[in-house]
Each structure stands twice: as structure tokens, then as C-alpha cells.
Amino acid sequence: MLRRLDKIRFRGHKRDDFLDLAESPNASDTECSDEIPLKVPRTSPRDSEELRDPAGPGTLIMATGVQDFNRTEFDRLNEIKGHLEIALLEKHFLQEELRKLREETNAEMLRQELDRERQRRMELEQKVQEVLKARTEEQMAQQPPKGQAQASNGAERRSQGLSSRLQKWFYERFGEYVEDFRFQPEENTVETEEPLSARRLTENMRRLKRGAKPVTNFVKNLSALSDWYSVYTSAIAFTVYMNAVWHGWAIPLFLFLAILRLSLNYLIARGWRIQWSIVPEVSEPVEPPKEDLTVSEKFQLVLDVAQKAQNLFGKMADILEKIKNLFMWVQPEITQKLYVALWAAFLASCFFPYRLVGLAVGLYAGIKFFLIDFIFKRCPRLRAKYDTPYIIWRSLPTDPQLKERSSAAVSRRLQTTSSRSYVPSAPAGLGKEEDAGRFHSTKKGNFHEIFNLTENERPLAVCENGWRCCLINRDRKMPTDYIRNGVLYVTENYLCFESSKSGSSKRNKVIKLVDITDIQKYKVLSVLPGSGMGIAVSTPSTQKPLVFGAMVHRDEAFETILSQYIKITSAAASGGDS
């Protein structure tokens, strides 16, 4: 480039004699050689005089040439920069495509599979070589002398031909089955776990619901038959079943029903519209999946699905734990009934013919399913007294119930020992309820003294230790009076709140259950998910409802307060009517 400028400077050609750089081919610096074709005009004496003049037009021509050259070089640099950016973008896109292609084809697993196949092939080749080597050694060891070999050559050829044909025929017939019985090492394949996704979790729950729908429909139809939802259908089913059992056709009847169900499913799969159900099916609205969800909607969706999964797993765990506790003699009086029934069935199967045993079992099952269960479902009190399977199932405990019973027994023992050690001088004429009410105490003292109540007022058994909460009195403006932390108790006639900060009883709150005008569940902070952890109680003396918030066992407390409130109000109403 400098040499080109030197040529321009020392030759001193005019502007028209230069090669226009803007019209030159777009090439790089390496492609441009020093020999640029220039027009060599004839110089006249006048031109030579102009060239000798340092301040003449030659200087202007050189300046304009340098500017044009710089401009073209700047354009070339911009063009090269653009090509470089395009190349980088193409490289980035190609890398993304390569990554997606690797994820789709799962090249790593294919490579591992290829390595395993190579190792297996090498092992097989080694085994084949060992077998061939052993055969050659055996042939060398069993090779007879030359005289005997010539004598028995024809017989051996015939025997070898016959044995080879026999081996070939045997391999063609049974070789595949022999290969199937060959032992191979078990391959431990590790399944890749999918990451947690709200959309995936919701879709799995919907799939589970759709998959369990045939089973739930079958159970609903059986329940409808037992409940005589359709009188004609239940009567026909009862008559057909009892006749089949009486004539010994119960098992063929069930097999025929299974074949009929599969035939109907085949026709439905072929496009036939066949809908038969005792209970009319209720079509649930299908919610279209939302593509764009906000963070709060995703969080609420995950909470809803987690709640459904929690309830489903809880029911399944209850069933499995009850079955386990039935067979593990957790409650001996219940398992003893099952034990005696199994012994009776065993002895009956040993001494009576199977036809008679099957007839008795089938008749009992039909009468129990169609008649006895119908009466028991219509009369719950009769069922609670005489339905043995129902009583056994309801009385079977789950593992959490066993833990609660054990903890309650331990606390009861501690209470009895403490009452014996600390209250030896209780009056003998008092009953158990009066004694418990008189000496029931909180952390700050006796219960009736703290709330200025009568001695027979004591907390109910459900809330003997109270529920921790915070009282929000929205009628007050001071922060100390607006929110108070403490414990909530429920007695037979009062709702008592004990403040945990002050020792004076002025900060405690006592509300008569009769004075309550409204009670409902309350959500203190609407931005948080869920149904809240508060209870709102309205009374005539307060302008705004009193809110007991931050209760962990909110539902239990609400049910207790509501049931006691209904009990007190109904008793007061009946007393007023009389």
C-alpha cells in the first residue's frame, strides 16, 4: 500500500490518468499486487513544469487519490466485518442444530451400546478360537495310524456325512430354542428422570384420571346394581345370577360376560357408538391447556395438583395400612375373626364337596350383594350393628391413628401421675368432670381464674392445650392492640383467647358462643396461595369481625367452634320454645 502511494506521489499523474479505485474489483489486500495498470500519458513541457511546481495541481491530485483510497479501504473493512458477523451467526446456529441433533439421536447411548456390542463380539471371537483350538487338539490326539486310517476311511466318511446331516437337521429344528435358553448377564439400564414441570405434572394427573375412568365406571355400575338404581336391571341381574349359581354355571357366566365386554370394546374401537351404563355418564368439561401462564398461576396449578396427589396417596396409604394391620395382629380381636373364618373355610373345603361349597358361597354372595347391602345402605344404624365386614374395616386403624393413640395414652398416664402427685387433697364428693374442671390450668395459672369464669368451665378435649394463633382486632388502631399473639380455647359456653405477652387478664378475650352472629373461615393475606389460616368471628360488640389468624390447625378449630356453637344455639332455641 505504501509503495502504491509512493508511485502516485513521485509520478505525479493527473486525476484522470489514475485507475478509479471505487471501480476496482473488490478484493483483499493479499490479492492486490503492486503492479496496478496505469495509463502512462505523454508528458509535455508544460506538464513537466507543472510537476516541478511543488504547490501546483500535483499535490491536489495526490490528496484526492489518498482520500479515495482510504474510503475504499474503509468500505472493504466494513464488508469483511459483515462477512465475519454472518459467519459467527452461522456457526452459532450450526452449534445449536448439532446440539439438538445429538439430543434427539441420543448419540451417547448409541456409543455405549456400540461399545458393548464390540466387547461382546470380541468375547465371542475369543470363545470361537478356543473351541477351534480344542477341536484341533482333539483331532490330533485321536488321529489313528495310517493303516487303520486307510481301512476305516470309507466308514468314517459315511458316518461323518450322516452325523453332519443329523446335526444340521437338529440345529434347524431346535437351534433357535436352544439359543433362547442361553444365559446372558443382566444389563442395568439407568432411566433418566424428568425434571419437575408444572405442565408435565398436570398432564400426568389428567392421564391418571383418564386411565382410572374405566375402573371407576365399573365400580359405579356395581354399586348401582347393589343399590337397585334401575329396578328392572337389578332384578334381571339378580335372577340370572341366582339361576346360574344354582345350576353350577357361575364361572361360565362370568367368562361369557368378559367375552361380551371385549366384543363390545372391539366394536367401539371399530367406530360403533355403543353406550350402555346403569349410571348415566356425566361429561366433564375439558379445559383447554393454557400456553402462557403467569408465575402465580403456575404456582397455584402446582399446589392444586399437589393437593390432589396428596389426597390420592393418603387414601391409598390408608387402605394398604389397614390391610397390613389386619394381617399383623395389631388389633387381635379383629384379626381373630378373620382367623376363625379361614379355619372354617379350610375345614369345609376338606370335608364337603366343592360343588356344595361353591353353591353356598355363591348364594351367600348374591344375597349379600343384592339384598343385604341394599338394606344396610338404607339403614345406617342397622349396618353399624350387624354388618361385620363394614365394622371390621371401619375399626381397623392406620399407622397415624396408632401413633395418636400411643401418644394420647402416654399423655394420659402423665396427667394421672401429675394429678396424683400435685392434688392429693381434692374433695371426695366431686366427680371426675368437676375435678378436671377445677384443676385444669394453663401456663399462667388455673383456667377459670385467668378468664374469670366458673370452675366448671374448662377447655374441650379437642383443644385441651389450645391452638396457637394471633388475634387481629381491626377496631383498634394501636399496633400493640391490633395484633396479639396467644392461645385460643373453646369451652362449652365460651371462646377464650389467652394473650402470651402480658400477665394481666385485660389483654385476654372471652366471647360467649351465644353472642356470636357469624363465624367463617378467613384468609388474612390474599396474595398467598391456599384457602388461608384464619377464622373470622362476628359479635354485636365489634364493628369489624375478630380474626384469629396464623392457625396451623385452622380446619380442626373451625369445625370444633362451629359444632359447639350449633349445639349451644340449638339448646338455647329448644329451651326458649319450651
Swiss-Prot record:
Residues 23-58, 136-159, 415-435 are annotated as: Disordered. Pfam families: GRAM. The keyword Endoplasmic reticulum applies. CDD domains: PH-GRAM_GRAMDC4. Induction: Up-regulated in the mitochondria by E2F1 after addition of 4-hydroxytamoxifen (at protein level). GO terms for cellular component: endoplasmic reticulum membrane; mitochondrial membrane; mitochondrion. The modification Phosphoserine is found at residues 24, 28. Expressed in lung and in primary lung squamous cell carcinoma (LSCC). GO terms for biological process: apoptotic process; negative regulation of toll-like receptor 9 signaling pathway; positive regulation of apoptotic process. It comes from the Eukaryota. The chain crosses the membrane at residues 240-260, 334-354, 356-376. Residues 445-523 form the GRAM domain. Residues 83-143 form a coiled coil. InterPro entries: GRAM, GRAMDC4, GRAMDC4_PH-GRAM, PH-like_dom_sf. Residues 44-53 have a biased composition (Basic and acidic residues). It is a multi-pass membrane protein. It is found in: Mitochondrion membrane; Endoplasmic reticulum membrane. Keywords: Apoptosis, Coiled coil, Endoplasmic reticulum, Membrane, Mitochondrion, Phosphoprotein, Transmembrane, Transmembrane helix. Interacts with RTN4 (isoform B). Plays a role as a mediator of E2F1-induced apoptosis in the absence of p53/TP53. Plays a role as a mediator of E2F1-induced apoptosis in the absence of p53/TP53. Inhibits TLR9 response to nucelic acids and regulates TLR9-mediated innate immune response. This is GRAM domain-containing protein 4. The lineage of its organism: Eukaryota, Metazoa, Chordata, Craniata, Vertebrata.
